[in-house]
UniProtKB/Swiss-Prot annotation:
HAMAP family: HflD_protein. This is High frequency lysogenization protein HflD homolog. Belongs to the HflD family. GO terms for cellular component: cytoplasm; plasma membrane. NCBIfam families: PRK00218.1-2 (NF001246). Keywords: Cell inner membrane, Cell membrane, Cytoplasm, Membrane. It comes from Saccharophagus degradans (strain 2-40 / ATCC 43961 / DSM 17024). It is found in: Cytoplasm; Cell inner membrane. Transmembrane segments: none annotated. The gene is hflD.
Amino acid sequence: MSKSWRELTIAFAGIVLATKQVAQLAKTGYLKTDEFETSVRSLFERNPASTEATYGSGHNLAEAFEELEKLLNNHRDPRNADLLRYVLGVLHLQKKLIKRKEMLYVIGNRLEKAETQAQHFGITHDNVISNIAEIYTDTLSKFPYRIQVTGEATYLQQTRVASQIRVLLLAAIRSATLWRQLGGSRWQLLLYRNQMAKHTHELYLEFKR
């Protein structure tokens, strides 16, 4: 596997890691703490040593690689419908965001403040998550296009769940930005889906626990 394909696949798995948690939260109200921490930490990795370092380690993406492989091989499967919709929504929203330099500045500046707060309270402390969620609300939620999250109203109406979902969508957009910086595009997904599925499987075998 070439270095470029490896990095592209890792970054895209970062999108899947965050969006699959959105789907899980919306339907069950719960998520895996370690996966949530990986997604939140990725928001604070502005100058990582490598693409993999954005997520701490490739091992933290093992389940995301597995999920991405399923998505690439069975994208028409109704069971993948919500995840696929969230992934495509994130790619669309990120493309809008990249044209708004002032919004990017606001997000970056406020994430720096949230990182300082996380160093004091802990990365998944309620105050930290609430502040990051507000960044999403004050910026990306202002676009006419909004990602519609579907699930159980019982969970979606909970403040905790709503905040975690916004944080995860912001993390997904951060990974989408990284993916595009590495040369990723939607055309690539259409034309080289089988090749990407192959690389995803190789990475899953490398990093599965």
